[in-house]
């Protein structure tokens, strides 16, 4: 569970988060493949502990083309409320609750050209462990997975399962858009696991702790 102080931050209106980012943080974007401008109908993955200022740093042109798969847990409600302020659509569901509806919604979103975003180690971990869901979805639609991270130069870590990060004032927030990974079609269980590990490693390569 997220601590109460972080939960309250999730309820700040978007303009407050934007002002906090503009005043207290320096922002950088690393997007060597120009995916913010061009990516459509892709699956994206970002670790759970990077979510606090992620929507404020993510450019608007990318946000409006993104649908996020968000846990049906109480923590997921905080995330859903936060991203809705920024124009990101949320689909609630997980492997234990509402998973079928979330998968159906994600399928429709990809078909409509939206990017579908996952926090693949949420909502309960283990930390930095990729779930199979993004791999299964990308394989079923023969689409790419794009690793995305937001790295703070200085931050506090909360004592939660994922060591949730709160960037310190006047630190630098760097949005890193990784190299797209082409997922083969119709993977079997062994193939899903093989590519799960490949995507996990690719996301870790752009994750700075």
Cite the ranges covered by each PLM segment.
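Catalytic core of membrane glycerolipid acyltransferases/transacylases, capturing the structured
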Residues: 40-97, 141
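Short, hinge-like loop/turn segments at secondary-structure boundaries
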Residues: 85-87, 109-110, 162-169
């Amino acid at each position: 569970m997220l601590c109460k102080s972080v939960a309250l931050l999730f309820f700040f209106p978007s303009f407050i988060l934007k002002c906090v980012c503009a005043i207290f943080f320096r922002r950088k974007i690393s997007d060597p493949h120009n995916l913010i401008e061009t990516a459509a109908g892709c699956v994206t993955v970002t670790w759970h502990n990077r979510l606090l200022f992620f929507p404020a740093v993510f450019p608007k042109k990318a946000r409006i083309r993104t649908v996020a798969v968000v846990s049906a847990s109480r923590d997921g409600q905080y995330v859903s409320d936060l991203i809705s302020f920024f124009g990101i659509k949320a689909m609630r569901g997980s492997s234990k609750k509402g998973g079928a509806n979330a998968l159906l919604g994600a399928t429709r979103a990809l078909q409509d050209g939206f990017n579908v975003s996952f926090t693949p180690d949420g909502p309960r971990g283990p930390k930095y462990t990729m779930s199979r869901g993004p791999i299964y979805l990308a394989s079923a639609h023969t689409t790419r997975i794009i690793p995305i991270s937001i790295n703070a130069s200085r931050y506090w870590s909360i004592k939660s399962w994922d060591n949730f990060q709160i960037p310190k004032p006047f630190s630098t927030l760097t949005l890193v858009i990784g190299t797209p990974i082409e997922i083969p079609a119709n993977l079997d269980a062994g193939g899903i696991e093989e590519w799960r590990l490949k995507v996990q490693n690719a996301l870790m390569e752009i994750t700075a702790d």
